[in-house]
Amino acid sequence: MSPFRASILLLAGALCSLPANAQQAGWSYSPLPGEGDRAAIGCGLESTPEIFACVAVRCEDDFSTGVHIYTSRPQSDAGRWAITVDKETRSFDAEAAAPYGARLVGDFSWVLHNLANGAVAYLEPEDGSPMPDNHIALDGSLYAINRALALCAPRNPPPVEPIGTPSV
């Protein structure tokens, strides 16, 4: 192989191995630094690195499950949100939280279940502020969410050596 071809192959391999640093349509691991496989993120069909509407399901530091809203809106993502999955809408409060814009608070089990098992989701801030395209297809969401939440599975405590009685 010529040195020119070898250098082209090395360059192509290096470019392909770079991490994704943008929000893209569909479900995948979170591209945010430090998140890795602890979070699954689903973004709107027309999402770009500059304009996006995403929802993330994350294994939190305390091994609980968190649902986060992450958008490119100039306003904060904290506030009250109407979340529609398969033509059923419910409202939820979200408080500012890192590394995404806001984390849902209260009972969000309906959101988690429907993100994993639904067909399409929409996010709408109840204050009426404009949103980027927020048609989030849920194809592949079950697989992505289950992989991320595997980190939240209960851990077995280290085995304890039995203490025998002195008379044995």
Name the predicted role of every residue range.
Residues 1-6:
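Positively charged n-region of N-terminal signal peptides that target proteins for export
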Residues 7-17:
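Bacterial N-terminal signal peptides
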Residues 21-168:
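A generic "folded-domain core" signal
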